[in-house]
Each structure stands twice: as structure tokens, then as C-alpha cells.
Curated annotation (Swiss-Prot):
It comes from Escherichia coli (strain K12). Pathway: Glycan biosynthesis; glycogen biosynthesis. PANTHER family: 1,4-ALPHA-GLUCAN-BRANCHING ENZYME. This is 1,4-alpha-glucan branching enzyme GlgB. GO terms for cellular component: cytoplasm; cytosol. The lineage of its organism: Bacteria, Pseudomonadati, Pseudomonadota, Gammaproteobacteria, Enterobacterales.
Amino acid sequence: MSDRIDRDVINALIAGHFADPFSVLGMHKTTAGLEVRALLPDATDVWVIEPKTGRKLAKLECLDSRGFFSGVIPRRKNFFRYQLAVVWHGQQNLIDDPYRFGPLIQEMDAWLLSEGTHLRPYETLGAHADTMDGVTGTRFSVWAPNARRVSVVGQFNYWDGRRHPMRLRKESGIWELFIPGAHNGQLYKYEMIDANGNLRLKSDPYAFEAQMRPETASLICGLPEKVVQTEERKKANQFDAPISIYEVHLGSWRRHTDNNFWLSYRELADQLVPYAKWMGFTHLELLPINEHPFDGSWGYQPTGLYAPTRRFGTRDDFRYFIDAAHAAGLNVILDWVPGHFPTDDFALAEFDGTNLYEHSDPREGYHQDWNTLIYNYGRREVSNFLVGNALYWIERFGIDALRVDAVASMIYRDYSRKEGEWIPNEFGGRENLEAIEFLRNTNRILGEQVSGAVTMAEESTDFPGVSRPQDMGGLGFWYKWNLGWMHDTLDYMKLDPVYRQYHHDKLTFGILYNYTENFVLPLSHDEVVHGKKSILDRMPGDAWQKFANLRAYYGWMWAFPGKKLLFMGNEFAQGREWNHDASLDWHLLEGGDNWHHGVQRLVRDLNLTYRHHKAMHELDFDPYGFEWLVVDDKERSVLIFVRRDKEGNEIIVASNFTPVPRHDYRFGINQPGKWREILNTDSMHYHGSNAGNGGTVHSDEIASHGRQHSLSLTLPPLATIWLVREAE
């Protein structure tokens, strides 16, 4: 039992400086009897009501005009369910007292959250509609162990931090409160007095929906239902599957022509999805769709890691978009950013007045390239927040893969830092051991919980084993972007063909390390911004040669071992750099048939042909699937190789990277017979010169390049051709 409340406690409670509201508010046994206390600012009268009968049991005395009420319930000794009849501004309202409910988080959940091993922390933390003791409302939970006081504020309480202070679970540092009547769609934030005594308003790290910039409140929103992984979607991610990825920034793929406004998720489902399917792509990759305050970050500086951005609609609208993609046979990859977060005061930065999510030392916790903060992966609750987020997108939205951004910046402590600007690890090395363990753990958990979904790493160094299993010392990613291949091949293609013979190795070097990782060949958004020019504009020569070079390059890329990725606009050879504030240049495809149509048709045919022939994708990561036929003809800039499937069927790929047609070009082959040209980037269908081999060509029993049989081909200028052997 306790005595009646002290005046200093009332003052602290009303001032918002009292950390343990449940010790004061609600129903308590005292020496005077069963006492009910309530903090109800602006109320004039308060009664305790029996819910079943509506009978008034006692009127509470106003002990402080600022809204503190208390009263003893006559003839009652044991706790019972009650309601409060409150008169505000002359009108009576019947409410349930949030301080009559017991602890919300179960002991096992609290233990797992503290340990950092809760697989799905989002099922406990955040805002969740619930029914407790027959009362509907919302339970709120937030991790802020160093805050002095935390309250829920929102549309349900006039954004008044005095009205709903939360209970601190000291064993976990989590604050919790069930608010009767709070419901889906209402805005809320957490108001806290932080570790330094400063008043802060924070959005919910686990909010499932959030306001669009410039507003920053969270929305009460229930968890979406789980999405079942189908066998078809699992197969589409496998190493032997054809994977051709269309990378998209939803805000600039296409816009309304009358006002330059974004398409909604549902409009994108109706326009983007069928377009990507028609183009023959197998996967859509979305630049980050997590809520973010700055359009110019392209989503790579998220503040709402669990909330799809409202720029294009609601959470359910985004689910509709994903469902439409799946119905069209497209898997969906989400760019995921666990490497850093922005410094905006309303979000994770100094969340409870301490460096809770980030490192305190800027040599570990600040990324000077992007003016962002770096997660403290060594803190269990932080890693749990991120691992749970990865699982959330896959399980609750049906995301099929996560492309992890800026992995190199995570795994190296000296990334983009000079001497003295970074702190070595415990062994004196430059590796961020905590980040490495976080990535391994994330990939392990995803492999166990949602097998079939995969991860891809954008890793720009030669860190070993990025896409190798953890038991082999790897990070456990399924795929890694081959940025070295991308840089080498683009450096080669931008050269005048006269000088390419001196840089032949830029095209041949990639195969030397090709089987060290499971590579994706990316022509991503990063290659068409910041003055790098468009892919088309990097090609040398006049307009005809630029387009011919681009077509030859695409033919080479789609044939080379590795999965494919192409950023939007490149499929029809957009001439300018990407602008996130405007639509792609779809007008280039208006009017009569032109070179842009030709490139678009080529990319579609590349996708369809690549998908149809197993030799082009089945053994991307097995040396048996590739063999050079001509690798050393640098004087004529000719390269020829075969792709092979598990059954030994071959496709010959020949590229001529000069504008000079090569007639009667003889080279040795493995399999004699009749070979049919199935793709020619110089075809008139693509607005080329239409040089080629008339459809089919027969091999000769003439030795060449160390082989008994050979083919004699016409290699079109600035072109790549594919040939398949026909059955006799």
C-alpha cells in the first residue's frame, strides 16, 4: 500500500518530468482504500464509472487545477474494471483509463529484444492496434533507454505530452503504453525529455506508415498480412535462372505531363509493370522506397525504414504494386540502406539524447561523403532493428530480393577517410568487424527464415567472399554487383575504335576473376548522373556510330557471364543524364521509327533470347559455361566466345568493336554443323547497316585456332552477333 500522492510528484507529473506514471496514475491500494488517480488537463469533473451498469461509483477530487484528480472508491477492496466520465468544456466523455492496464511486452519478447535476437521486433515495437480487456485501442512501444520521460502525442490527445506518459521497462529500456480509442490512420509521435533534459519530438523508428515530407509524423497502421513465397518466384532468383533486372526510380520513370507530378503506386502497377514485362525483364529493382525527407537523396537517406514513402500512395497501394508485378511474372528487388541514416532531428539521430543508433565518435559514426550517420552494428538492439527490417519487407510485402547499398562503406572503417580520421578495430585492422558480422547474420537469418529470397551486394572493392557462404568465410550474399566489369567495359567503349586495340584487356580481364563471386553486371543509376553522361553519350563517333557502339555493347553484356541489370532509360538510349525531378524522355519514342526504337527493340530481343536459351544463363558461375574461341585479336578488336549449358549445347558470341566489317573471318569451333544467327545488333530491325551472314552458315573442316573445324563469318561493323547450332 502507498499513501496519498505527494505534491512534488503531482508537480513533476504535470510538468512532464516524472518517469514512472504508472506508480501514480490508475488504480492503487492506499491506506485510505482503493484510490483512482488521473491526469486530465482541462477537465472540470471526473467520475469513476462501472462499465456494465454505467453507475457512477465516485467523483474524483481535483487536487490540482492543472488537471490532477484523485478519489477513493467506497466499499471496494479489490481491483476492478472501470471507466472515467470526464467533463471537458461542458461536455461529458466516457473514456477508458490507459493506466489501469498492466505491462504490454511479454517477458520473452523483452528478453529477446534486449539480447538482439528477436527475429521480428516490429511485431512488438512500434504502434499496433489491439484489444485489451475488451477495450480497443493501440499499444505503443519505443526503445529509448536513456530518456527521462517519454509520452505518446498525437491526434487523439491534442499533441499534449502531459496526457499519455509511458511506462519504462527498465530491463529493456523500452517505454510502452496502451491508449484506448487510438486507431489506424491517426498521426502520432513520441515526445521525450532526453538524457540531457531537452524536449524532443521523434517519429517512430518502427512506424509502418509516415507522413510525406515536409511533415514528419508517424501513422498508426496495422501490420500487413504475410505474403506467401511461391515456387515460381523462388526459382526466378536461383543461380541458374535468367535474371535481367530493370532498375527503376519510381518518382521519375514517368510523370503526369500536365503537372509533372508523380505516378501513384497503382498507376505504376498499370503502366510500369506491363512495360517491364513486355520488354522481357525478369525482375524490377526499385531504388529505395522507404520514407525519406529529401527527394535528391533518391531514397538513399531514409528516415522511415519500415514505412513505404507516401509520395506515391499508401502502404496498401504499394502492396498492390508488388502484387501486380508478381501477377505479371516479375520478381521485385528492393534497394535497402542499412549503412547509414540522415541527421534529421525528428528521426534516429541522438534518439534519446544519446548516440543510441549511431556511434558517438564521429570517426566511427559520421559519414562525411553524405553527411549521414553510421549505425552502431555492435549494439544488439540496433542490429536487431535492421535485421528485422530486412525480414519485414520480404515477409510482409513479398519483396523477392534486397540489394544492399554501399557495402564497402560498411565493412571498412577507413572508407573514404584519411589517416587519423578513422579508428582501427580491436586487432588494429581496417575492417569493421561488427558490420561484417551484421551482414553475415542478416544473410544467415534470411536464408533460414525466407529461403528463396536473396540478397545482392553493391560492394566496390575486392573484399573476398562477398557472395560466398559464411562457413567459407564469406559474407553470405547470393550475388555481388561487378563494378569492376562495369568500369572496365565502359572505359573501353568510350574509346575511339582506333585506340581500342591498345586496351583489349579491359574486355578480357573480367573473365579471370569471374568465378570468384556470383556476379551481376550492372549499368545502374550511378552511371548516368553527376556529369558522367548517359551511356549513349559516352559512345564515340557520330550519331550512327554512337548507337551502333551501344548496341554492340549491349549484345556483349547480355552474352557475358553474369546476371544483367539496366537502369531505366538506357533501354531506349536516352541521350541526357537521369534527372530525378523529371520523367524519362519518352518523347524520343514518339513519331516515326528511329534509332531509339531500334535500341528498345534490341533490348527486348536480348532479354527474350537470353531467357530462351539456357546456355546464356544456366552456368553463369561455372567455368564450363564459358570458353574463349578468339581472345587475342586485339589488332582488329574482335572477341569470340561460346556460352554453354549443362547439356553441352553452345551459343557462339562474336563481337567486332571497330567500324570495319570483317568479311570471311575464320575461327575454330568445338561443334561442327550448321549455325544460325539468332541475334545481330547490326540488323536493320535495330537501325543497323544489316551486314551479316544471311541467317545460317555451315562449318568447314578447316583447322583454325587449334580446333579441327571452323566457321567463316562476316562480322558486321560495331556489332555483336549470336549463333546457335541447329540440329542436323
